Every structure is written in C-alpha cells, then in structure tokens.
UniProtKB/Swiss-Prot annotation:
Designated name of the protein: HTH-type transcriptional regulator BetI
Span of domain HTH tetR-type: 8-68
BP-aspect Gene Ontology terms: glycine betaine biosynthetic process from choline; negative regulation of DNA-templated transcription
Pathway note: Amine and polyamine biosynthesis; betaine biosynthesis via choline pathway [regulation]
Task of the protein: Repressor involved in the biosynthesis of the osmoprotectant glycine betaine. It represses transcription of the choline transporter BetT and the genes of BetAB involved in the synthesis of glycine betaine.
Alphabetically ordered keywords of this record: DNA-binding, Repressor, Transcription, Transcription regulation
Organism whose genome encodes this protein: Burkholderia vietnamiensis (strain G4 / LMG 22486) (Burkholderia cepacia (strain R1808))
Taxonomy, superkingdom: Bacteria
Molecular function per GO: DNA-binding transcription factor activity; transcription cis-regulatory region binding
DNA bind region: 31-50
C-alpha cells in the first residue's frame, strides 16, 4: 500500500529532476530514463506518473506556471488598487526568482519550441498568453480607453517576452533590474497621457 502523500512527493522529485535535466542536457537529451536516474527512481515510475516525455514537460510547465501565477497574485495584492503599481507587479512576477533560474529559463525555451508541435502544450501556452494579456488589459483599462488598453497590453506583453527572451539567451544571469526599468519606463510612457 502506498504511503499517504507519496504521489505528490514523487511528482515534485520528478519535476525537479526534469528541470535539472533540461538545464544540463536540453530537451533532446532529457528522457524518462535520464529523469529517473536524476531522481534515483525507476523509469517505470516516471512513466506511471507522466506517461511520456511530453506529459513530463507539461507537468513541469504547469509547476512553473503555478509559480508564475502565485508570484503575480502575491505582487498584485501587495500593489493594492493602483493600476501603475499593479502593472509593475505583473511585470515583476515575470522576472521573479522562480522564473529566471537557468533550469526554469531553459525549460521555458524548450516548452515554447515544443508547444508549436504538441497540442496539449500549445493549449497551455495559449492559456498563459491569454492570462497575461487579460491581466495587463484589465489594469490599463482603469486608465485608458478600452481599445488603447488592449493595444497597451499587447505592447507590454511583447516587451516582457522580449526582455525575458534576451535575458535568457544572454548566457549569464538575467539583469532583472535593467529589464524592470525598461518595462516601468514603458508603463509610465503609456500612462502619461491618461
């Protein structure tokens, strides 16, 4: 009989092992066997919990996305009701420590690439994209007309993605302060006319 809570402990071990494997070997070098080896468990257990490699990547990204959504919620609540502060909070969440470690950044890049080919991952990416745009649009709409708010949200989402991508590809730790400053300046520019 399995121990109570063991399923979640195993899943967490395997997700951590997946992040480390993608960090060290990339997605092509990450297999159910390599993840099992890093987690010090059998390949059969990995297969039991996740089915296949795409299932493992999906579960890993759901974990990363939960961290992102938690950081976003935490920061938006702390920002209270001020739209500028809440927009900055959304930006900051995307550059939160949970999103800018080497294993997580490499996993994001692998996920984006794989989501163009795997429908389950594509749906997950679509949910993430819509959530970001919706959150940004809701805050901009408190200060801008609806059409301008949608346009501003699209622009800021593209800036967040671009700054994050450049940082991820830079080959070293991401300069979150510089990224945040650029995004904050953009927010200030958009809201200056409001």
């Amino acid at each position: 009989m399995p121990k109570v809570g063991m399923r979640e402990i195993r899943r967490a071990q395997l997700i951590d092992a997946t992040l480390r494997s993608i960090d060290e070997a990339g997605l092509p070098g990450t297999t159910l066997a390599s993840v099992a080896q890093r987690a010090k468990i059998s390949t059969g257990i990995v297969s039991h919990y996740f089915g296949d490699k795409d299932g493992l990547l999906e579960a890993t990204m759901r974990h990363v996305l939960r961290d992102l959504w938690a950081a976003t919620t935490r920061r938006r609540v702390a920002a209270r009701k001020d739209p500028r502060a809440r927009l900055r909070a959304i930006v900051a969440a995307n550059f939160d420590d949970t999103q800018v470690s080497a294993p997580v950044m490499k996993t994001w890049l692998a996920f984006w690439s794989q989501s163009m080919h795997e429908p389950r991952l594509k749906r997950l990416q679509h949910v993430n994209t819509r959530r970001l745009h919706s959150n940004l649009c809701a805050e901009f709409a408190k200060r801008l007309p609806r059409a301008k708010a949608r346009e501003a949200a699209s622009g800021l989402a593209a800036l967040i993605d671009g700054l994050w991508l450049r940082g991820a590809l830079a080959g070293g730790p991401i300069d979150t302060r510089a990224a945040l400053k650029l995004a904050h300046d953009y927010i200030d520019l958009l809201l200056a006319s409001a």
